[in-house]
């Protein structure tokens, strides 16, 4: 989906927060305002056609509209079509990570991710933090090249689940947009 007339300062969190309940998001990209445009635009790709159709139907309905940060945005089908992938599967843009709380916390993980790949953050939730264990839920802007890259980087850098590893488990979590 192609979304126009977004607030100039739109964030991934506010954009994706307005898409809740539509379906798993595969990728999101925000284009900030540029020469001749005062508003931002975004591309949102869903994992499956049904989610894209549900979102497009909602956004096209004059009685509902698609509102982000108080502005009515215009949603159109993207001219570049994407094939459905992982239909009915468990891949998402959300990771749930458990492990040593010295590593599994907001500051350490976001700093570490920043050294491995570029990412956009929707939400970071600390589910548990004790002296012995940290558990967090990281909602990236996209599965493609963000949540997927984070999972691979963690698996390649740490012996996940092995004795002595600071990362005990990494799994895909529920996408709040689904």
Model region roles, listed by residue range:
Residues 1-41, 47-58, 66, 79, ...:
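Canonical RRM/RBD RNA-binding surface and closely related RRM-like beta-sheet modules
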Residues 64-78, 158-177:
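Conserved short beta-strand edge segments in small beta-sheet-based binding/regulatory domains
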Residues 83-84:
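Extracellular disulfide-stabilized recognition modules
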């Amino acid at each position: 989906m192609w979304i126009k007339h977004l607030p100039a300062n739109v964030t991934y969190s506010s954009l994706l927060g307005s898409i809740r309940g539509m379906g798993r998001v595969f990728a999101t990209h925000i284009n900030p305002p540029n020469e001749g445009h005062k508003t931002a635009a975004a591309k949102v790709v869903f994992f499956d056609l049904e989610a894209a159709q549900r979102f497009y139907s909602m956004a096209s309905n004059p009685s509902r509209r698609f509102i982000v940060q108080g502005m009515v945005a215009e949603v159109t089908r993207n001219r570049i079509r994407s094939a459905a992938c992982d239909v009915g599967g468990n891949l998402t843009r959300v990771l749930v990570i458990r492990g040593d709380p010295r590593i599994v916390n907001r500051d350490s993980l976001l700093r570490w991710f920043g050294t491995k790949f570029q990412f956009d953050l929707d939400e970071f939730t600390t589910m548990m933090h004790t002296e012995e264990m940290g558990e967090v839920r990281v909602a990236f802007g996209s599965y493609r090249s963000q949540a997927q890259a984070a999972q691979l980087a963690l698996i390649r850098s740490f012996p996940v689940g092995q004795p002595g590893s600071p990362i005990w488990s990494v799994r895909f979590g529920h996408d709040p947009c689904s």
